[in-house]
């Protein structure tokens, strides 16, 4: 009899847990109309934009509004045999802001696929219930794919090396002297990276191999180091790129 009571109590507990979980799943998150950023760490200017000479409270350009300018000259080579992209680019950056810039920030979006990328750690969905054999091997067995930028050199317009620091998807370039308002600077970056197999992770960029034809089809995006935005709102926009979202150019 006691055994029956324990079994009945256990079934009743499980039934209650299932009902509660169902009720929690049916509750939809409410949010204020027009407000989509619910992060507790969002920037104050999203809620309290102060008007100034650069822009009005509505965000419209003011009399002192400016935009920086970056000109690119690139030599790009697609190594189809090894599924790699090699590039060398010269960037001419025009400082149209009223500020003197002591360093430059460059976005390295492809580093989201680097071997040591922290992007996978942002996945808070827990362990998948089921894996395909390929996805399981890719996640737990195979050596992580290294699709990040390999920066071979960063040089000024006279060919002298510039020191730089890479932090995940951002690179800070140190310049010899501050770039004053109204001036411009030219520098070059030589780089390459491995192109990922699009059929494995369905990334925004990658290739798909067709054995019958013996060739690859490529979809390429965010493939070159590009200048980060410098604006009157927050100065340098040097937030990390984690694989979702977009930044201004």
Where would I find each of the regions flagged by the language model?
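Bacterial Sec-dependent N-terminal signal peptides
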Residues: 1-25
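N-terminal, polar/Ser/Thr-rich
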Residues: 21-85, 221, 239, 243-246
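Acidic glycine/proline-rich low-complexity segments
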Residues: 31, 109-144
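Ligand-binding face of N-terminal immunoglobulin V-set domains in extracellular IgSF glycoproteins
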Residues: 83-112, 117, 128-132
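Short, hydrophobic/aromatic-enriched beta-strand segments in well-ordered soluble domains
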Residues: 89-91, 95, 108-110, 183-197
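Short, solvent-exposed loop/turn and secondary-structure capping segments
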Residues: 103-104, 116-119, 166, 197-206
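Extended, low-hydrophobicity, Ser/Thr/Pro/Gly-biased non-transmembrane segments
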Residues: 128-153, 157, 190-249
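Short strand-edge motifs at loop-to-beta-strand transitions and within beta-strands
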Residues: 169-173, 185
